[in-house]
């Protein structure tokens, strides 16, 4: 027979030639014992099985071995069942042809076609026909090489018990067959019990009831009204019963073909069943931007899986950085544990200190760590305020204030640059000065009561200047030893008998620098002569006045007068740049004398102070954020030299070890889940159409047709089977890609959680942290092993696909070449006979005419 059947039969004979106990006489009973399948496999892949150990009488084991090896190692789905081969004396011819055609497609590549014959040591004695088929019936030898359509139809009539679907009980056509755990299903019937989606090997597990299955990948995503749950049912209503069976067979054949790929990844299936939480248990947001969504109920970040709330709509693509929400939550928790000092503000609320978040967002009015420049004076306890009258100091401060204002008005070069060495943050002060005039000053009365109840030195309220409200520096006077008293309270507090409040030196420095920036912003800061310049001591006696103050101190003190100027009624005047001389110089009547000392004096002793809590507050406030500091000018090194005493311990950097960055672990280009499921939908529709056509074509082949039409139908049948195999192969690849991406995202989440855990200092670790570290490390190793197994399976599939593609190209080229050769040979033969005669005739005529012409 010259048709596809004869060609396939001849190929099987060549492959099984020389093997003991194998005689290929037809495409039915000759394959019943399974030795023919094993012989074909052994010729091309002798490493897969030992042919000498097989027995002709062990029909079940021979067929089982051949089907399993072909499915697991070669990716050829098992269309046949070993039990059918045992129960039937004459196997179905069309089933054998379809199955063997896949062997042919796999092994007839250019490199595998010329396989060597079996070794002589195997004693390949050709047995007699009777020994080849012990159960041969009288009519079987008549089938021989040429099986008539009647034989196909006769073989198609008896229905073996295993041809019924285990789910619906109806007949399973050849193109619909799917074997799962020893049972035969339609592909349409082999669905998840919960979401009705088609199951594929490696992505399902046993259901709650016997004989039921549940998908492990998409069940939580799709729900009952999901992507593929209702579509096949609607198609079943629209199509006839044969089409419905075709769709059922699609399920079986799809899964059956996918079993090939899944068999290569049995370890993956087992791992997904043992550890379902790694791939499917926790839901996850589909977009990386969904950081605001509530955390899911799980201890660790989840892979890219949509939550049940997104069942009706496919998830949006998620680039593999997935689930940063949980990582951010864990990072914030870890940050709180590691850097707890940065999360709380030790400054009391009456001081008007803004929160840390406000400091981060809004421009700073005065950095809290300016106290780091002048930390030594703050460690000395302040003296108790004397009880002398307020008059002399008021007069002295008035003179100091007036003198300072006059010098400011005249822009004396000796007075302007001197205050700047005490402020290494001039750039920040210049930025502050532009925004401060628009801020009104609040009333001074309400915050006055609270500091009085705490300590007399708290009488400096945050209402005298908008700057002092937004920085914790004014609280330093409670712990500073000697402070400079200015005319500030004369405008911010009513006359009273309470002791005069103190003002910290850094406040004076900042104010003087800010004022100088207003008058001459282009003038650079001057460097002080020495870090240990003697500061001016102004005792609280009537004899002291502004005359005893050095120009530097005089300038600083005069600038401090401006600090006390802005009150509820004097703010516009104080902030008017054009008229600095209009500042009010009313004497403050309720203040007691207070000693004056600038930051440079470190030798003056001071009596201890009763309370040290403000000092602790200042220390903690200095540690808030040491990384937002600007590079200090040349004055900061000299000032640091002055603080030779016990320097404050600088807080460690926020974070312990490497930075908390979620690493991307994707190996290939990321494919969004929406695209994956969209392509799987398209594949499923194509499989539905192919199975429907296959059912009709199978009925025609079994119904009987003439020889010419049967050959054409067989060619169409083989093409259909091959197309379906390609679709199933692509679906299996998509499933692997989906698993791989889930594992990659899970690995990124586990690594990030592990980084957050390791970022915590070991001294703060608990037993739970150590146990959690072990769990995360073990899970990380498991994820890496699973990813490696998937990559290996994908590589094997791609190699096999390349071989099959080369084989098909080679076959097409060979057929085209043979056709061209035949046509060329015919043309050349006809051309040569006529051409030769013409040439011979022309030559004779030319020779006969030549002598006559010469004569």
From Swiss-Prot:
Q: Name one GO molecular function term.
A: small GTPase binding
In chain numbering, where does the motif NPF2 fall? 625-627
Q: Where is this region: Necessary and sufficient to associate with tubular recycling endosome membranes, mediate phosphatidic acid-binding and membrane tubulation?
A: 692-855
Region called Disordered, residue ranges: 110-165, 226-253, 269-659, 815-855
The record's note on quaternary structure and interaction partners says: Homooligomer. Interacts (via NPF1 motif) with EHD1 (via EH domain); the interaction is direct and probably recruits EHD1 to membranes. Interacts with EHD3 (via EH domain). Interacts with RAB35 (GTP-bound form); the interaction is direct and probably recruits MICALL1 to membranes. Interacts with ACAP2; the interaction is indirect through RAB35. Interacts with RAB8A (GTP-bound form); regulates RAB8A association with recycling endosomes. Interacts with RAB13 (GTP-bound form). Interacts with ARF6 (GTP-bound form). Interacts with PACSIN2 (via the SH3 domain). Interacts with DPYSL2.
Give the domain note.
Probably exists in a closed and an opened conformation due to interaction of the C-terminal RAB-binding domain (RBD), also described as bivalent Mical/EHBP Rab binding (bMERB) domain, with the N-terminal calponin-homology (CH) domain. The conformational change is regulated by RAB13 and may modulate MICALL1 interactions with functional partners.
Query: Protein name, please?
Result: MICAL-like protein 1
Native source species: Rattus norvegicus
Q: Which gene encodes it?
A: Micall1
